[in-house]
Each structure stands twice: as C-alpha cells, then as structure tokens.
C-alpha cells in the first residue's frame, strides 16, 4: 500500500485480479471490488454444490435401480427353482408371510420382519442347481441323490452371496440355515441351538408348516392336525422352542394368511413390496 496515495502497489500483488483492479482506486473502492468478486465466487461455489448434489442424486437413483434389478433377477431365479420342484410362487409367498409374522410375534423390529418377508421367499433358490430327476422323484432318494439334495442350501447361499443389499444378505443366511435343526442334527453345517441364525430357525418352521400342507410328487398333503402334532413333537429337537411358541400364539392368523394367498394365488411380486407387509396379512 502506498502510504501517500492509499493505492495498492501492483508489484507486490501482481497475482491478484482484485489488486490489479484496485491499483489506482481509493481504499473504499478497492474493498467494493473485492466484495463483488467474493460474492461472485460464492455464487459459483453454490452453483457447483447444486450440480454436485444433482450428480449424487442421479448416481444414487441409478444405484437403487441396479440393486432393484439385481434383487428382481434373483427373485425370478428363486421362482424358477420353485417351478422346477413342481411348486408355484404361492409357496414362496406363504413361507415369506409366515416367517415375517412369526418374527413379529417374537418381538423382532418391523424393519427386520419386512426384510425377512422378502428374504424368506428365496430360501430354496439353491434348488436351481439340483436336477429335476431328483427334485421330482416319486420314490425314496438314493444315498448319492440325497447327498446332492443336501447341497442346495450351499448352492443358494453362493448364488446370493456378495451383495451389499440387506435383503440379499439375509436371504443368503436363510438359504444356508433353513435346514439346520435346533438339536444339531440338520444340514449342511450341523449347527446347534442359537448358533443357527434366527432367520434360519424361523424359516425352518415356516417352510415345514407350508410344505407338509401341500401335495408333493412323493407324498400327499398332511392335514393340519397332523402337521401341528409333528411340530409339537419336534419342539426343542428340530425347531427352536421360542419359534414354536410364537408360531402357536398366532396360528389363527397364519391360517388366514395362507387362505388369503391361496385365494389370490399370488398377491404381488416381492419386488413390489415397499413396506407394511403386515397390512396385507
């Protein structure tokens, strides 16, 4: 600054546009120039921030669309596995509904119940890797055939593994654990008690209740009275006692849900369910 004129010395601020503009300007005028440039810089920064937010929004929307497409593809694959086994999508929906309702009765958070409703429907996705001659065999399986059949939980878990989506992570857990027994006599890992993930313990009972109530190529459907007797007998052995108790506490609701799904055949795609599943059942 020149002590006599009050002007900025250009030689000491050569890199500053504001300084150059103010070289022959009184001090108050220099401040005004700098204020205008500062306001312009802030406005440009604000525009850049808005543009960045738009880019992030577009990225997030694209990611959600990709994740949704991935989930839908796997859900369709699970349906293909059901059809391969002679089932329809209604079995998947019933198991999903039963599992979510049992989880709710056990005091699980609503978000968990909603995710489980979707994840449980993919419990048998691994059957896509089992030959139809085994899945639809009318007689007893040979030891080799049974060994192959017991691999479907691992196959399903491997198909579903690696996703960051909570529903697919839980579906992988369900696939691997839904044939474990509380006593440790199940497969594929022989887990015991609470070492079995809760999702697997719940879906094990939901699947058992539904599967025995429908005709299969190797047996006729059991009446409900017989199925309920079997569940009571297997409490603490095949099934977690807490899960069994929750099941019987809401048995009337489960039966109504089954009737609703059967009547409609299919209520909706799991991919279209965005919450409040409990309002459906």
Predicted features, each with a name:
Residues 2-13, 17, 22, 36, ...:
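Metal-dependent catalytic cores of enzymes that make or break cyclic nucleotides
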Residues 69-72:
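Active-site-adjacent bridging/hinge elements
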Residues 4, 27-29:
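Generic short amphipathic/hydrophobic targeting helices enriched at N-termini
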